[in-house]
């Protein structure tokens, strides 16, 4: 996987790059739409939603985006709306000898690919382009109204002795033929690390959630296709970094194509 390292900009320039959303702007809160789409066996398959939050430890408005994600997950259910915080770009922080950094080279690659111009910024099921955080609630509502074309199940087998996890991603076609890429990521919750706050202060004990750690497979996934009624299993192995807390690590798997994310699933490794 090609890794691209980007030079971090100065703090002053970074601050001016962070999007500033007026607090007076209100979220659009809506009822949950129906998302049921039974397969041939009568099993109800729900299309889940992926929020890719392009964030950074030096972004003063990014904690606001984290709060909005929490509200969305409270409204729709954290099992139905899966968030991944991709620390990246000029406002991302790769760390020092004394301070924990959460930005990754792969995250920077995604940041550049999507042409992110401000942070916080996000993708909701990769439909509708780059959105500021005040637009996420409506985008989630719109995405939730669509039917699932496949189901995804994740089976994780973690070995404490060598800190490796065997990941089985099981997919089943529900309707039509789905072609695209199967992407598998590792994320971690409850990481305590520095974060710039909306009031300009620095919180050294900020708790970061759903932090993108690495791509288990290629940065852009593996080629994937599935027909209605077809079942497939893809198996991967990941060795955890020594600094990761296994109890807080989850696997996120999703299938995407030119029409966006078709299905997504998340499961903790322990």
Predicted regions mapped to residue ranges:
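Bacterial Sec-dependent N-terminal signal peptides
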Residues: 1-50
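Intrinsically disordered, low-complexity segments enriched in glycine/proline and serine/threonine
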Residues: 5-6, 55, 266
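Alpha-helix termination/capping residues and helix-transition junctions
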Residues: 12, 75-78, 116
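Membrane engagement elements in two modes
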Residues: 25-33, 37, 64, 71, ...
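Intrinsically disordered, low-complexity boundary segments flanking structured domains
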Residues: 35-39, 69-74, 110, 137-142
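Local sequence-structure signature of Cys/Sec-based thiol-disulfide redox active-site neighborhoods
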Residues: 40-88
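Short, conserved sequence motifs used for protein processing/export or organelle targeting and
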Residues: 85-270
């Amino acid at each position: 996987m090609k890794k691209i390292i980007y030079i971090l900009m100065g703090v002053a320039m970074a601050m001016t790059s962070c999007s500033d959303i007026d607090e007076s702007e209100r979220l659009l809160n809506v009822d949950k739409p129906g998302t049921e789409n039974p397969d041939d066996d009568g099993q109800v398959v729900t299309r889940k939603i992926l929020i890719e939050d392009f964030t950074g430890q030096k972004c003063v408005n990014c904690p606001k985006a984290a709060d909005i994600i929490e509200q969305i997950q409270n409204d729709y259910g954290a099992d139905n709306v899966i968030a991944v915080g991709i620390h990246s770009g000029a406002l991302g922080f790769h760390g020092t000898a004394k301070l924990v950094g959460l930005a990754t080279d792969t995250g920077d690659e995604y940041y550049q690919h999507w042409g992110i111009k401000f942070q916080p910024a996000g993708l909701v099921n990769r439909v509708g382009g780059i959105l500021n955080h005040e637009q996420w609630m409506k985008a989630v509502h719109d995405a939730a109204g669509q039917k699932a074309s496949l189901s995804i199940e994740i089976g994780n087998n973690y070995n404490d002795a060598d800190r490796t996890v065997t990941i089985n991603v099981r997919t089943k076609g529900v309707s039509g033929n789905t072609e695209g890429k199967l992407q598998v990521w590792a994320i971690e919750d409850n990481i305590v690390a520095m974060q710039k706050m909306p009031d300009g202060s620095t919180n050294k004990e900020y708790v970061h959630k759903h932090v993108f750690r690495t791509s288990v497979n290629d940065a852009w996934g593996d080629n994937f296709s599935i027909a209605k009624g077809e079942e497939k299993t893809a198996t991967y192995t990941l060795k955890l970094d020594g600094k990761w807390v296994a109890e807080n690590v989850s696997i996120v798997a999703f299938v995407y194509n030119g029409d966006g994310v078709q299905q997504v699933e998340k499961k903790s490794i322990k």
